[in-house]
Regions:
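Primarily recognizes the serine-hydrolase "nucleophile elbow" in alpha/beta-hydrolase
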Residues: 1-27, 207
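Detector for methionine-enriched segments
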Residues: 18, 35, 56, 89, ...
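Ubiquitin-like/PB1-type beta-grasp interaction modules and other compact soluble beta-rich domains
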Residues: 69-71, 75-103, 111
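Generic detector of intrinsically disordered, low-complexity, polar/charged segments
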Residues: 6, 33-35, 43-44, 87, ...
């Protein structure tokens, strides 16, 4: 593989549940978008397809969900610190036990940069009350992290990827010819809420193969040298930390990484094709 273009990547699944709660811990009520399992797009009169019908469900977390969220988020700093990532200036990206530190500032810097670029283009930012402005210049100098995550809001319950009820799309991803859905983390298996007493964690080799973090820098792998990663600031399908972790690892290895968090963009892709094509032209 010569180059990678990734829009809103759902990846690093082993750590994604922890990262999600690092972002959304404390948000106990949210809207969950649902659609019928196996539902196909509906054709319209013109012959084109329309997206599947989706419904909005209001979800309120119970005390057990909140406790699970807290537990997951508490383990995220250890994961981040063990990665030993650093930014472009060589600063080590770390978190303390409360989830604060240079890594959090690193993530915030991408959102701040995106907001300033949007403002420079004339975008009305008045609804984004989590933004902190410089009183003299009017530029965005910081964000209120908790307020930002409340604004975006979670769209998944704790155990966002390895669901405790073993029914997420990612659980299905790790299914086998005999079992539709499987857990892929020990944590979710230990906290499984289904009546099934034979809780099965999918083969560790398969879980490893699904995570690019296990191959970036591995002598057993040949890595792409060019990466373009985009994850919108309004996207809650994973934590914004996840794609930035992958990009930082690639950058630390000396690869060419173009990484950004387009402002107020939800879970989508191909929204900046001119920029994408220019990037492609410049790396060949």
């Amino acid at each position: 593989v010569y180059a990678v273009s990734a829009y809103a990547p759902i990846t690093n699944l082993d750590a994604a549940d922890m990262a999600y709660e690092w972002s959304y811990k404390g948000i106990t009520s949210f809207n969950k978008v649902t659609m019928g399992q196996g539902e196909l797009p509906q054709a319209n009169v013109g012959g084109n397809t329309a997206p599947p019908q989706r419904t909005m469900q209001r979800v309120n977390l119970n005390a057990d969900d909140v406790a699970y969220s807290n537990s997951l988020s508490e383990h995220f700093p250890e994961y981040v610190n063990n990665l030993q990532l650093h930014d472009s200036m060589g600063r080590v990206l770390k978190l303390d036990k409360n989830g604060n530190g240079t890594f959090k500032n690193y993530v915030k810097a991408f959102i701040i940069d995106a907001a300033n670029k949007a403002q420079a283009k004339g975008t009305d930012l008045s609804k984004h009350t989590y933004l902190v402005r410089d009183n003299k210049t009017g530029t965005i100098k910081d964000i209120n992290w908790e307020a930002y995550n409340r604004f975006v809001s979670r769209s998944k319950a704790p155990g966002a990827f390895d669901s405790r009820s073993n029914d997420s799309g990612e659980n299905n991803l790790f299914g086998t010819s005999t079992t539709d859905n499987n857990h892929f983390t020990i944590t979710a298996a230990l906290h499984d809420t289904t009546p099934n007493q034979d809780v099965y964690v999918e083969n560790a080799k398969i879980v490893t193969m699904m995570n690019p973090m296990n191959y970036l820098g591995s002598p057993a792998a040949t890595n792409a040298r060019y990466y373009r990663i985009r994850y919108g600031t309004a996207d809650s399908n994973t934590s914004v930390a996840i794609p930035l972790i992958v990009g930082a690892r690639a950058q630390n290895l000396g690869y060419n990484v173009d990484m950004a968090t387009p402002f107020d963009v939800d879970h989508s892709g191909d929204y900046d094709l001119d920029e994408l094509f220019n990037w492609m032209d410049n790396i060949v």
